[in-house]
Amino acid sequence: MEYVSLFVKSIFVDNMIFAYFLGMCSYLAVSKNVKTANGLGIAVIAMLIITLPLNYLLNKFVLTPGALSWLGDSFANVDLSFLSFILFIAVIAAFTQVVEMVVEKFMPALYSSLGIYLPLIAVNCAILGGSLFMQQRDFGNIGEAAVYALGSGIGWWLAIVALAAIREKLSYSNVPAGLKGIGITFITVGLMGIAFMAFMGISL
């Protein structure tokens, strides 16, 4: 039941976009059509599922105070937590290159449509934010970290695909000239955020 609760909360209550505003640059830039948004959303899910459990292991066995005690008593008091940002980003950047090569090889059309935003997953704050939240919340095991990664990724994917679908519909609407483009997009995102706020009072 704890896993189900964590999964649902990470999608709706603690949504990366609407609760923490993480990954907004690519969220706004790549949400012009559903197909491209779906591709980036799946890439973000894959990155979170791969990197967050790896960073959990890195945090548990290397970074936290006393984590290196398995190397011997002389390492029992070593605290490498100050290296969290650097090492988390290194793991994320390494696997971003792998994802980029896979997408370029097997999905060239998607690779072309995503453009610079695919390699920029390496510095997507939603990916890094997932690892930092994992560290802050001190999950009890790697299973919780994996469930949180999956839920957070699905939440981000849901947000970008929903916005892309709305923006496709808006392209056929008579939007006032002063609000066309990013203006009406900001209003739409704000209304979506208000809708997701309804989940924040739910206790799971």
What are these regions (language model features)?
Residues 22, 26, 44-53, 89-98, ...:
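Hydrophobic core segments of alpha-helical transmembrane domains in multi-pass membrane transport
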